[in-house]
Amino acid sequence: MVTTAEGDPDDALLYRVADDLFHQLGDDDSGELAGARERYEERRGRVRQDEELWEPWTQAFLEWFAFEWEGAGGAPGARALAGETDPRRAAALRAWLRSQRALVVIGRHQPGRVPARDLCRGAQFEVSEPRSLHGVEPGDVVEVRLIGFEGQVRFGRTFLYHPTGTAAAIEERVEQLRGQGRTAEEILDHVAALRLRTERYRHVDPVRLYRAATEELGEPDGG
């Protein structure tokens, strides 16, 4: 749903710094990455490699591990920042480390500009986005990472889309969880787990799955 477009140099630098770090993470053999993934999936659910969500789930995990992991050595992004001598790359790393995951409703967007309303925190953002969001309609709900860099808010690398038409049900669920005192991170994990459920129960209306979040469903019948 997202295609690459030629952006400004700030966009290129921001994403290149993250891609370089993700590439380094792929060479990790300490067991830290595997342990972090297990913890991540305990919170959000385990996706199988043959499922459609495998790629966005994995990319979202890498972003979380790189910039939010609280292991003994701290987040890999923080470790990279400590050794970075280039001031522009260091600024980009700091922006990633200050970024936050968000569950947003997409507004009516124009080329390069995407309005996004954060359901968990209530904030409204005007996001600078050079990539084309094919098939994304106003009112769609997406989990994204919001990054403030060089005076602009930008999306991260990963987009986890929720089914079209589920926005009202998701907002109801988010309000219910906020009323229970749940944190934004807890709400994000919960709603992501519901998104995974829509893949496992394709014979069930997604709206029902979001509205009946605590309802026990039978095993998928393949229908």
Tell what function each PLM region has.
Residues 112-116:
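Short aromatic-glycine-enriched beta-strand elements
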